[in-house]
Amino acid sequence: MRLRNKPWAKDKIAAYPQYVIPDPETKRGRWRELFGHDQPLHVEIGTGKGKFITEMAKLHPDVNFIGIELYPSVLVSALDKLIESGLANVKLLNANAKDLTAFFADGEVSRIYLNFSDPWPKKRHEKRRLTYRDFLALYDRILAEDGDIHLKTDNQSFFEYSLVSLSQYGFVLASVQLDLHQSGMTDNVMTEYEEKFSAKGNRIYRCEAVRPPRRSS
């Protein structure tokens, strides 16, 4: 993905600390206090321009949402949507997924969304894939006992890799859809990428994976 540089993006993000949390480490274990509601916490990793997370937040006011995006030039579009909507149950982080355990306490998150993650197709880049075992270990820590991962992609190879990686780690595949838009699922919220790829006729793959039983220390 080629990113359009927006030199002003960081300054705009910094101007809205009520939406893009500047010090997420200080909220670890206390996100429900920040939101002001004791509701389930759902996290989207790679929130992009924010269409998915803002629409989900509108549909589910009884859930608190956090969108994580590494690139300021992309996150600023999600910020614009959040400012316009005025949603109180969404916060954003300009952060790296490698730092998840610094932001969230063990068992604090109920669900993780991985929507159209970079597939990093070259073998030498395997460790960068968001379903590589090192990332799964982070998800395992922050997810609640009955927490789960919802994944969508149009990349068949990445999907197959993810199914194997999740299974080998111990996640239970509760749902696997090889053609989401022909599956009859009625409550699917599409991302920007999903709209683009499905319009081209690309098949969309989806799975739900439940975290393994908590390992005893």
From Swiss-Prot:
* Source organism superkingdom: Bacteria
- Give one GO term, molecular function aspect: tRNA (guanine(46)-N7)-methyltransferase activity
Q: Where does S-adenosyl-L-methionine bind?
A: 44, 69, 96, 118
Does the entry feature the keyword Methyltransferase, yes or no? Answer: yes
SUPFAM superfamilies xref list: S-adenosyl-L-methionine-dependent methyltransferases
Q: Which residues form a coiled coil?
A: none
According to UniProt, the reaction catalysed is: guanosine(46) in tRNA + S-adenosyl-L-methionine = N(7)-methylguanosine(46) in tRNA + S-adenosyl-L-homocysteine
User: Function, please?
Assistant: Catalyzes the formation of N(7)-methylguanine at position 46 (m7G46) in tRNA.
Q: Where is the active site?
A: 118
- Binding site residues for substrate: 122, 154, 191-194
UniProt lists the gene as: trmB
Q: How is this protein named in the record?
A: tRNA (guanine-N(7)-)-methyltransferase
